[in-house]
Design a protein with these regions (language model features):
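Short beta-strands and strand-loop turn motifs
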Residues: 1-3, 55-60, 109, 141-146, ...
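Active-site and donor-binding regions of nucleotide-sugar-utilizing enzymes
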Residues: 2-102
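A nucleotide-sugar donor-handling region in carbohydrate enzymes
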Residues: 3, 80-154
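General structural feature for long, well-ordered alpha-helical segments within catalytic domains
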Residues: 16, 73, 87, 91, ...
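Generic hydrophobic alpha-helical segments
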Residues: 16-24, 127, 161, 165
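Short, glycine/serine-rich, charged loops/turns that create anion-binding
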Residues: 39, 62, 112, 147-148, ...
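Conserved catalytic-core segment of nucleotide-activated headgroup transferases in glycan assembly
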Residues: 129-178, 182-189
Length: 190
């Protein structure tokens, strides 16, 4: 299925609900944990809550600015979940404003920070060699994620990006571009 079509998220969510429901029916968990605001997680959360499985949601109450579906998906996930683990006090307040019980909301910080701290990364010499850099201080890592509800503006965004890159070519900076996420419009960016 074309992941850049406007119906792709809906189709992915519907398939995800079915697949996760089948898996949950087989393993019968006492608790299901889901993370953040992605449509794949939304599908899993719908399946778990509709099956009566206690569901914990991490990163509810956060805000993403800039025309994505993230906030509406995240807030929907929050309303469906039973337990809430937030990244900050503002997120906790938002969840409480949505009517969730204070006894089910816990401010725990951002779990991925712990993973980053526990991970081993390449040292400076490895990075310089791997990417052909003169040194690590002269790089820009660039990622452009699509904004699904503004898919028609991607070419206009690229004009601005292209102009910025032209100006950066005059410097001694090296630009490393990464792939976008899989949201609608990602293929066009690639």
């Amino acid at each position: 299925h074309d992941s850049d079509s406007l119906d792709s998220n809906s189709i992915t969510i519907s398939k995800g609900i079915s697949l996760v429901a089948n898996a949950l029916a087989e393993i019968k968990p006492d608790l299901f944990i889901v993370y953040a605001d992605r449509y794949e997680g939304f599908a899993a959360l719908i399946a778990s809550t509709q099956m009566g499985i206690v569901t914990a949601h991490f990163e509810g109450g956060d805000i993403t600015e800039g025309g994505t579906f993230d906030d509406s998906v995240r807030h929907s996930m929050t309303k469906l979940a039973h337990l809430h683990f937030t990244t900050n006090e503002d997120a906790t307040k938002r969840i409480l404003q949505l009517g969730e019980s204070q006894e089910n909301v816990f401010t725990v910080g951002l779990p991925s920070v712990d993973l980053i701290k526990a991970s081993e990364f390449s040292d400076e010499d490895e990075l310089v060699k791997k990417y052909g850099l003169k040194n690590i201080n002269n790089i820009i890592v660039f990622t452009q994620h699509p904004i699904p509800i503004e898919k028609d503006n991607i070419s206009k965004e690229f004009e601005s990006i292209e102009n910025a890159f032209k100006n950066l070519r005059l410097t001694n900076l090296k630009i490393i571009c990464t792939f976008p996420n899989s949201d609608i419009g990602g293929k066009e960016i690639i």
